């Protein structure tokens, strides 16, 4: 049984782990919600999704604080049959995971936790108190084995793709450099707007742009000379393989995919939340493997004065790419699967 959901940082490593376990002959059930990315991606991958209510931990005192423990326990108890039938529960975080963790503890099913971010979320901080089997992706305050983020096989094996062919399949010129732009699984309005405004400057510098704008964005899909904009990319392995550099948020899934493939990036940490995204890329920035800018400081002038000079230097791009590759971890899926199967014994 795998539990987790919400954003790509929880769902992508869950799917990578599910695929490997399925390859080894194990049956898979995923516990998630109807609201998160898992509601679409898990069934599309061929796995059974059992949806439960998402119950956020209360952030301040109020009526919800009083009722929370009872609702939380009720969800855990409703999972009794499924959790007891499972040989192991592997959790990837997100609010949906926490009741599953408690159910595993109550009913004696081995529990494994994977934390994708440098700053662990509430659910995984809670879950880590219930088990000794904890895996982490970055140096973290959470005690656990440092393994990295499990990557889908398509990403892990993408180095075998021909770069020129990848560009052609994406509608780009195989002979010109490519900038990949993505705001993460949910898109990013600020990134979209600035990149659209800077497109002419980028093309004038000889840089092609593959722009993944995200679902629900205000910009329609578009293909023109040296610029391709899509709402969603079903083949991120192609997009990453095709590019020389990326502009991205700093979510754990994206950071891990870029490091695995040695693609440097300009990271723009999500400005809301607990600051986890800045921590996810701290080592990369310190090593000069990538760049970082605050969301409020990202504008057309920054692209023109800071980014285009980097994109125009083959030497700088090569050096940064080599440094990124040093941080890549391609064996995280195997390590997590080994931990999960070992917890059963």
Model-based region annotation:
Residues 265, 283-296, 308-309:
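A short acidic/histidine/glycine-rich donor-binding loop in glycosyltransferase catalytic cores
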Residues 27, 37, 106-164:
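Active-site-proximal region of nucleotide-activated glycan assembly enzymes
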Residues 46-48, 77-90, 97-112, 125-133:
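Glycosyltransferases and closely related glycan-assembly transferases
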Residues 309, 316-330:
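A short, well-ordered alpha-helix in the C-terminal region of glycosyltransferases
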